[in-house]
Design a protein with these regions (language model features):
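Predominantly recognizes leucine-rich repeat
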Residues: 1-4, 13-155, 163-181, 192-213, ...
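Calcium-binding acidic motifs and repeat modules
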Residues: 7
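Conserved nucleotide-binding/hydrolysis modules and their immediate coupling elements
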Residues: 158
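Extended Gly/Ser/Thr-rich low-complexity repeat segments
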Residues: 10-11, 188
Length: 789
């Protein structure tokens, strides 16, 4: 199903006995039900028992939509953008199932939901709304999925309501727990009896607690059933967690998160939770040490026997990580330590299953004692200079590499003390290196045959020697004045290297793509490019103001795409480019500043006839003769060309299938004769052409299927007879003076009509009221101001 769906669903008018309507194959990103479906078609299907509007992005529904649909038993609004349910939903006395999951804009339910006396299944998981009081009055409700309770200052009755709901399934969130007064009140929630809740979130916010013992008692009584699988505790205000949190009886608990318990000074004994796979501990500001208590007291089971991912973050006072050395974390695959500025203790030494290690913002943490990481694939270090030292010290690095024989990716960021990286001893398994913000780094000359897949250097001042890499990115290396691209490199990107002057290429380079951005002192491309880079297919130059010409001999013959932007001297000397020698060139883009008018008046600039896509900005001397020579041209983008009017009058290549005219301020009309020559044109887009007042009354190409007009402030109308019978889509956007559409109506071929920000036109197109509505009502997809009609 797609936008509007009127065309597909209008036949339902004749199916008054239809019992089930479940649209499938919804386009997830942008799909709406039209007003014609909601107002005219659905209310006629009075025999419907099951209706799904899932994934449609409508924000509003007619308030009386369900008045005539009283037989509905199943209704699905999941994944919609609906903000409010129609009040008429409360007349659906036969409704048994209502699905509202992932309705992220829905904030409340209708007040009289208790009238749904037969409602048995309600799913509000991941919806924005909070569960209202009156849901407890739904006596037939057997299954409530994804309930979210927001407690307030008068929370006693709310906890009682929660306690009365024995039919909770899936996820349950309880927010505002700071309003719970004592143990007796939290006991009313009856949490242990909620056997079908699998995901539980408990959240406190606001002021500090008056009594930490009371806070612990409250959490103690919120102990869930042992069937729980995921548990989130956020903002807990006690100083210590209750004992149940680490009880091995929680044999199904897989995912646990403890965050923002800023007064808590110890962690619970979590090591004996038998199935725990994912553990996050964040924002526990009073924790100074992870002690033996964290691992639990059992002597027969390895602590954290099932844990696969462990994250510590924002632990501002944490200093020591106590290690048992009893085989803890035997299957741990990912370890992340982030924002622990005082952590100085060592990590567990034998993490043989670890595949990804991330250390960030831990300035005191050191890895001077090698740890066993025999299966490590990814190692990321950021803002942790003492960890970075391990790469600087060849002996220490060699020792550590003995335990990292499977390493694939190395990422080092902002380790300012890092001065060297012993490339010669890097393992052959290493394929990706990213180094950023290490200003003192000087790479040694590689002496082995290591060849990476990716190498990225950002903010490293002197990368004089580089290992071979298939993909190479160098950015913001401000002290770099000359650069040799090594062999085996296939794609190269060089950005923001302010002092780069000389760029050269090693023999044997198989480069296919070269991008250079913002290197304003670079005065030339590598010499002998044609011979040294025979495989180059893509060249992009952006803001390289000192480059005046291409190398002697020209560009490589196999070049297919050339993009030149903000390279004034180079573009003004384009007569010497000799692009006509490039038989494979398909795509050419030139973004200029308009300074070529005097320099190249009367130019004779040649391009190869192989070009299929041409994009031009601010090029004043582009001629019609040159364009006509491009006999294979399919796409033309013309932005701010003062001569655009004459180019259209003199004619464009008849091979064009797509033409975009942007910001051509002198364009006042579209010449009929010039357009009629474009017999293959499918898509015409006109934008920001403020002098354009009208379209030709006749002469639009008979092949045209899509017409888009945007930001043309002086355009007043569309031609009475000028829209071709082939047109299937028309878009008009922000044309404030357009006040009419053709009186004869739209071509019958049109299936998509989009009109937005046209204030004079909008009243004429109002759904079921506007004067022009009868002439467009047959069009399957209509959007007026982004609203489906």
């Amino acid at each position: 199903m797609g936008d509007g769906d009127f065309g597909k669903l209008k036949t339902l008018n004749k199916l008054e006995q239809l019992r089930t309507l479940l649209p499938i194959n919804i386009q997830l990103r942008w799909c709406h039900l039209s007003k014609r479906v909601l107002h005219d078609i659905l209310p006629r299907l009075t025999s419907l028992r099951a209706l799904s509007l899932s994934h449609y992005k409508n924000e509003e529904l007619p308030n009386d939509l369900f008045i005539k649909l009283k037989h509905l038993r199943f209704l699905d609004f999941s994944w919609t953008n609906i903000k409010k349910l129609p009040d008429s939903i409360c007349v659906l006395y036969n409704l048994e199932t209502l699905l509202l999951s992932y309705c992220s804009y829905l904030k409340e339910l209708p007040l009289h939901m208790e009238k749904l006396i037969n409602l048995r299944h309600l799913d509000i998981s991941e919806a924005y709304l909070t569960t209202p009081l009156h849901l407890s009055k739904l006596k037939s409700l057997h299954v409530l999925v994804g309930a979210k309770f927001l407690l307030s200052g008068r929370s006693g009755s709310r906890m009682e309501d929660l306690g009365e709901l024995h039919n909770l399934y899936g996820s349950l969130s309880i927010l505002g727990l700071q309003h719970v007064v004592d143990r007796r009140e939290s006991l009313k929630a009856n949490m242990r009896e909620k056997k079908h809740v699998e995901r539980l979130s408990l959240e406190w916010s606001g002021s500090d607690a008056d009594n930490s013992r009371t806070e612990r008692d409250i959490l103690d009584e919120l102990q869930p059933n042992t069937n729980i699988k995921e548990l989130r505790i956020t903002g807990y205000r006690g100083t210590k967690f209750p004992n149940w949190l680490g009880d091995p009886s929680f044999h199904k608990l897989i995912d646990l998160s403890l965050s923002n318990g800023k007064d808590c000074y110890s962690l619970p004994a979590l090591g004996q939770l038998p199935c725990l796979k994912f553990l996050t501990i964040r924002g526990m500001h009073q924790i100074t040490e992870v002690t033996e208590e964290f691992y639990g007291s059992s002597s027969s089971t390895k602590p954290f026997n099932s844990l696969e991912q462990l994250e510590f973050a924002e632990m501002l006072e944490w200093k020591q990580w106590g290690v048992l050395g009893k085989g803890e974390f035997p299957v741990l695959e990912e370890l992340s330590i982030d924002g622990c500025p005082k952590l100085i203790g060592k990590l567990p030494e034998n993490l043989s299953s670890l595949r990804r290690l991330r250390i960030s913002k831990c300035p005191e943490l050191s890895l001077e004692t090698p740890i066993q990481l025999s299966n490590l694939k990814e190692f990321e270090v950021a803002n942790s200079p003492k960890v970075g030292v391990v790469f600087d010290d060849a002996q220490l690095f060699t020792s550590q590499l003995e335990g990292m024989k499977q390493i694939v990716k190395l990422d080092i960021t902002d380790c300012k003390s890092l001065a060297s990286l012993p490339i010669s001893i890097l393992p052959s398994t290493l394929k990706r290196i990213r180094i950023s913000g290490c200003r003192e780094l000087k790479l040694e000359a590689p002496i082995n045959a290591i060849c990476l897949k990716e190498l990225s250097l950002v903010g490293c001042d002197s990368p004089e020697f580089l290992p071979r890499a298939r993909s190479l990115s160098v950015r913001s290396c401000n002290n770099l004045t000359r650069f040799l691209i090594p062999t085996a490199t296939e794609t190269v990107s060089i950005r923001d290297c302010d002092n780069l002057e000389i760029l050269s290429v090693a023999c044997g380079t198989q480069m296919t793509s070269l991008h250079i951005y913002n290197c304003e002192k670079l005065n030339s491309l590598p010499e002998h490019m044609q011979q040294l880079l025979p495989s180059l297919k893509e060249l992009k130059l952006v803001n390289c103001s000192q480059i005046e010409s291409f190398p002697v001999g020209g560009l490589p013959f196999n070049l297919q795409q050339l993009w030149i932007s903000c390279c004034k001297k180079l573009v003004n000397g384009r007569k010497e480019w000799h692009l006509q020698r490039l038989p494979c060139l398909r795509d050419l883009t030139i973004h200029h500043d308009g300074s070529d008018e005097v320099v190249l008046a009367g130019e004779k600039w040649e391009l190869p006839c192989s070009i299929r896509r041409l994009s031009i900005w601010n090029l004043k001397t582009l001629s019609s003769q040159l364009l006509k020579s491009l006999t294979s041209l399919e796409y033309l983008f013309a932005n701010n060309l003062p001569q655009m009017q004459s180019l259209l009058e003199e004619g464009l290549p008849s091979s064009l299938s797509e033409l975009k005219l942007f910001r051509n301020h002198d364009l006042h009309s579209l010449p009929t004769e010039g357009l009629q020559r474009l017999t293959w044109l499918r898509h015409l887009e006109i934008r920001d052409c403020h002098s354009l007042q009208s379209l030709p009354e006749s002469g639009m190409p008979s092949s045209l299927s899509k017409l888009t007009i945007q930001h043309c402030s002086n355009l007043q109308s569309l031609p009475e007879s000028g829209l071709p019978s082939s047109l299937s889509e028309l878009r008009i956007w922000n044309c404030s003076n357009v006040q009419s559409l053709p009186e004869s109506g739209m071509p019958p071929s049109i299936s998509n009509l989009y009109i937005s920000k046209c204030p004079l036109l909008k009243p004429l197109l109002e759904f079921n009221k506007g004067d022009y509505w009868p002439k467009i009502a047959h069009i399957p997809t209509i959007f007026i101001d982004l609203e489906s009609q």
